[in-house]
């Protein structure tokens, strides 16, 4: 009996065992069985598990905010990029959060990092440790929605980490004269004490201003202040601190370690004697605030202050911090941590990594009074630290030279709000180690004497003007913890930033110079910012290739003026006509597309419009063009015009436009709605003969360049472009919008619906949804008409997409929908993004990057994961019992590494230097054309197959399902581990990669065996090829 071809074979049926099927009845399963199922598939911690995870020597990243590229892009796309953004108002350093998230969404990670470091020289540190829930995130407008606020800290960390991986140095402000040509004031000696966040920030901004003799004196043999010594490695790795210090040193700032501010060493008086013109005090609060009950207790007995304990942990866990490798403190048994601030929680989670079996965090007040940010408290809770509120320490019990317990009394708050201690309620808590985290003070008399003659306030801290950070001595400034205004790293950074401007103002005044009334601190610059992105086309010089399309962003010339002020290189006017052809628009007329599904807000992948050309007169446009050219002579203004098929009309309007001073004309032969009914726009642009004649008429009428704007709504766009060239056009715009009907409501009425009758017409679809059509049009024209200028438009929403069009053969890029999604300031992102893309092409060490995207390392939730298969020769998913096995294997490996006691290698920063010429815009135009051809030119011998990275796989089975129901049934799906496996029947179709939610979890690799298609029935004849 012949096999039934339309039924799956037995081996395929086996593969399909877990493939979804339409439900035909309710499912029955006992509660006890479901509990077992739940346990097997559980990814989050079991609420019934009370054991601490073994964390000894595990200093891997534990932050919930950390993001990989996939997570960063999704989160950045979700951001609303609000007007007058509240998040920015809540940031102590006033980061332009809206703009840097815009850059991340556009895959311009350099642009995002530049924006961050411009306002915060410690942008990566703050991205990792900022209490964002109390700052920027607390003001996020998405708090008013179901999905909640944006993970701003994670996005900031991601962008700056990518920039760190680029290994590109900071440079002086390119607009400054060389150091030797700066005025004498910029050679003034400036000293800073303490190499912590406040001083690093202050020194960075002073160096950016142009000061060349800046020295930081640091008491310790390491730099970074509390960022190095007291914030644990699992929250802030030392290589991050070192990276930001190296950026500062790129500008010539010097650091001298082993030099302290003390009456026995360096004082303000001796500093002045040595010719220093200004000083900044950023020494933090160096001494612990120690309760009297701890007097006489030592570390050997089991007592530490946070000022003792955290630096010891840092030295034992932070590679590169010190020249030597110190062991971690040996903590065993039960640990009591006293305090309720961020430092107390850092002590608690660090104690677990030093071997503590159990940690109690004890504090005087209640949970609602905890000063630590929720992020820190949540991490300690997840790691099974215990919280004991309403307890005040009374006595430490020592036996046999070791701490064995502590006594506490209960605290209560009375009706007046005062806290009282009840001596009748005693609590006895056994412990092996006690860590006091009651804050820090400035109490060393030698340090205070060294600061003489500055005044101190009632808290024993330097008295400063909170606006200028100036002390009672005009030449001395202070900031950070030592002043008492800053409570966080980012606030210390801002203290240094604030002080830098007023130090600048003070120093200049000493040399008889003045500064601007409004503070103007320089931005962050690197060699990327020096890349030239100007381009010449049709004899016109464009300062950059980005311009406004003839569309809604050019509704008025005042809008074009604002666009030029923002940085756009050129603009087309909204298409205008002779007065006899003037139009009046309908409303509603511009709507969001349906191509993004139920996604509302910015980032729409398409819009549909039934808007006609400009309602303004030709006289308005011509006068305005004259004004724009007078005020912006370096910007290109192109007048977009439209007439019916009438030589006299085209001649008249073209001459008027030329006389206005326009650099060039665009002939709109492509408006897909409304104008065609009037014999204009599309009515002219679909016929090569009409296009050829119109171009001839205009060529005869004007001397300036002109470009025909083509419609994609034709069978062969090349024939239209060729006709335009034959008619004398200097180039073409490709393409206008695609004619479409965006959607119908459930009652059959359209949207947009005009008037009571709810009528509509086919409109023009724009946005990224039409990019594939536009790319095809541009490449087709560029291949057929080599060297013929093309102004690309159609889905350009970033530097990355703009580069695609340049590679396709376009010379300049018109933008509309992206501005509708955002605003004119996206131009800054586009320019920095394009500069970065060009610059990175010259760095040999980054050739495995895709644009600004680094090569993907195996990760889960954005954090690198160890390859379990390499540790135990077995593949394990990350859920249920397998997750517990993974944790156990990782814990054992961490202990093994600790026992090996391998010395830390010193950190070395090697900046990448271009080894190839940095390409210009001209160099990249048409680069992709060599790869395009006919299907017959493609090799059917060089086949690929899919390869899955099991460590990155999240076991969703999307690859399995699409392969089953849309492909070749070539993926097996394990019923217990949900690990997919590619079989040898894979045809390399790439559907699995296309639907996989994890970037680079699936890769296509070369097939190692010959590919033999399954024909179903043997061929009756031999194939021709």
Swiss-Prot record:
Recorded name of the encoding gene: DPYD
Q: What is its EC number?
A: 1.3.1.2
Keywords carried by this UniProt record: 4Fe-4S, Acetylation, Cytoplasm, Disease variant, FAD, Flavoprotein, FMN, Iron, Iron-sulfur, Metal-binding, NADP, Nucleotide-binding, Oxidoreductase, Phosphoprotein, Repeat
A GO biological process of this protein is: thymidine catabolic process
> Subunit notes for this chain?
Homodimer.
User: What is the protein's given name?
Assistant: Dihydropyrimidine dehydrogenase [NADP(+)]
Organism, by scientific name, is: Homo sapiens (Human)
The UniProt annotation places FMN binding at 550, 574-575, 709, 767, 793-795, 816-817
The protein's job, in short, is:
Involved in pyrimidine base degradation. Catalyzes the reduction of uracil and thymine. Also involved the degradation of the chemotherapeutic drug 5-fluorouracil.
- Superkingdom of the source? Eukaryota
